[in-house]
Amino acid sequence: MIRSVSLRGFMNINDGRHAFAPGLNVIVAPNGAGGHNLLKLLCAVEFAGAFTTRWMTKLGYAQSITGRLRENFRPGCVGDLARGECAVELEHEEAQGTLAFGFKTGAEFVSVDAMPSGTAPGRPVFIPMQELSSFVPWFPKLFEMWHVGFEGVWRDTCSVLGAEDTKSEPAAPLAALLDRLEKRLGGRVAEHPDDKSLVVIREGAMVPMSELDSGERRIVMLARFVRNGMISPGMILFWNEPDACMDDELRRLVAASAAAFVEAGVQVFACTHSEALADLMIGRCPPGLAARIRL
């Protein structure tokens, strides 16, 4: 669980410290305030392995974080992300100590000043504003083979969307949520046996993603992540614009999904421009398990 982050000089995000709840954290930010960038920064650090091994050196941290920042933001060099001199400090519940790193404008690599001594299990999942259900399974291969102008988190998301279903049933709150998601879709999300693309099985017939609208495809992503265990207790979910392309019915389903994730022990970071959506999502969570962060 991420406890807090302190930022100075990172892109368009105002300097300051933000403390996070153990459950749902809704980042409410106007256009241009950097909400999406904050999600990608936190996800980059988590993916970098900064809290997954006690044997990593400061140089290893620096190389790993640099690589993830380059993939997530696609800058000319990592120093392009700094306003003069940038400093980031991140506290993690499971790791003892603080991860602190920084870099200056024009720098090729970050410099790690302090790192935690403990470990924190689990890998994050990032759900972007765009639906990616129709990008499986071809996008990760395209990303690796060619220099394409897409964020690295898209590749990561598509990779976990394509992961096989777990043999065990999801935890109780997630099992109930999965049933609700699949009822809304009219069937179970599965892979096409021939090309491994995602389909919805409705009354024995395979419905391709091209026959669903964008909002439904985003629900497909949620159902898939629960079914294959990529959203499970103890992990972290980064969720940009959860209600993008959704009507009021799906927006309520999104709020219910966030509450189920929190109940199952998932830490959720959601970014939105809408105070109304923040109210809806936070209102579904028990007191003390949700927070609103304004940028």
Show the residue positions of the predicted features.
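Switch/communication elements of ASCE P-loop NTPase nucleotide-binding domains
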Residues: 1-48, 203-295
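Phosphate-coordinating catalytic segments in nucleotide- and nucleic-acid-processing enzymes
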Residues: 3-4, 45-234, 288
